[in-house]
Curated annotation (Swiss-Prot):
The active site is at 184 (cysteine persulfide intermediate). PANTHER family: RHODANESE-LIKE DOMAIN-CONTAINING PROTEIN 7-RELATED, THIOSULFATE SULFURTRANSFERASE/RHODANESE-LIKE DOMAIN-CONTAINING PROTEIN 2. Pfam families: Rhodanese (PF00581), Rhodanese_C (PF12368), UPF0176_N (PF17773). Catalyzes oxygen-dependent 5-hydroxyuridine (ho5U) modification at position 34 in tRNAs. This is tRNA uridine(34) hydroxylase.
Length: 328
């Protein structure tokens, strides 16, 4: 059956004059054609994911390609049955990718147009995965890695991308003298991060050109050596990559069983992304810890209108109580 919706993933590092006004004009156009999605605009470029029917997405691509400096912008296209977004957002930011460099010194930031790692095709990246002397580094957030990753890739001990530069500095001796290749969802983070590694003194740095999204669509590699699914920042949450021998690597936060279903912790002040089944979500009140389960603003409890007696009953079923010492 034909899929009626297209999802466009794209980015481009290119100087944008009067980027705030550009963002406002861009939003107006997107709304005028009924496009949905999320786009970031900065002085350094544009980064977005949008969705719509064939006609709408074609109008959008034609419009973007008509803009000065964006004639060759590369759209990565997925075909889906449903919209990937509910609304349309275009926001101006200082950067389309924030590296978390010291003192938020934007003048000291990396310009990928001047410094970036060598581009690797999907075939070249697959060869790097099979090379025991090459370090493969995942540059995404921890919850993205936990849902799916390249076989043998290093999972940095970080919660989010902004912590990665410091982690690399702390572990520099482990791979300073080795070939390092990095990857991310669509390539936008790696453009900047690989450039940062070059500036830090790494001599042989590569990046997967077009990211995981391109690797999964390549007719030669067909996503092989990817385990699990790829996390995406839209209503789909997870998409397939490996079309040769797919596997599940995600594990339920509570019992460790295979799982590819993400929810946010019920405690709004925690909001951690956790993998869990619907059964365990109900059982543990969608709280990633006891503290989050009993938090007075637990969203799962309020959404399901649970009484205190019902909360106490569910806590008792897992050996907990309202007044026990909190454990994180």
């Amino acid at each position: 059956m034909a899929k009626d919706i297209r999802v466009l993933l794209y980015y481009l590092y290119t100087p944008i004059e009067n980027a705030e006004q550009f963002a406002a004009d861009h939003l107006a156009f997107c709304k005028s054609i009924g496009l949905k999605g999320r786009i970031l605009v900065a002085d350094e470029g544009i980064n977005g994911t949008v969705s719509g029917d064939y006609e709408t997405t074609q109008k959008y691509m034609d419009y973007v390609h008509s803009l000065p400096g964006m004639e060759d912008l590369w759209f990565k296209i997925d075909e889906e049955n449903e919209q990937a977004f509910k609304k349309m957002f275009v926001r101006y930011k200082k950067e389309i990718v924030h590296l978390g460099l010291e003192d938020n010194d934007f003048d000291n930031d990396i310009n990928p147009l001047e410094t970036t790692g060598a581009y690797l095709s999907p075939k070249e990246f697959k060869e790097a995965l099979l090379d025991k002397d090459t370090v493969v580094l995942d540059t995404r957030n921890d919850y993205e890695y936990d849902l799916g990753h390249f076989r043998g890739a290093i999972r940095p001990d970080i919660r989010n991308f902004r912590e990665l530069p410091q982690w690399v500095r702390d572990n520099k001796e482990k791979f300073m003298d080795k070939r390092v290749v990095v990857y991310c969802t669509g390539g936008v983070r790696c453009e900047k991060f690989s450039g940062w590694m070059v500036r830090e003194g790494y001599k042989d740095v590569g990046q997967l050109h077009g990211g995981i999204a391109t690797y999964g669509k390549d007719p030669e590699v067909q996503g092989e050596l990817w385990d699990g699914k790829m996390y995406v920042f839209d209503e789909r949450i997870a998409v397939d990559v490996n079309h040769v021998n797919p596997t599940i690597v995600g594990k339920d936060w509570f019992d460790g069983t295979p799982c590819e279903r993400y929810v946010n912790c019920g405690n709004p002040f925690c909001n951690r992304r956790i993998l869990t089944s619907e059964e365990n979500e109900d059982k543990y009140l969608r709280g990633c810890s006891h503290e989050c389960r009993v938090h007075p603003r637990n969203r799962y409890v309020s959404k399901n209108e649970l009484t205190q007696a019902e909360v106490i009953e569910r806590l008792a079923a897992i050996g907990e109580s309202l007044d026990q010492a909190a454990t994180v």
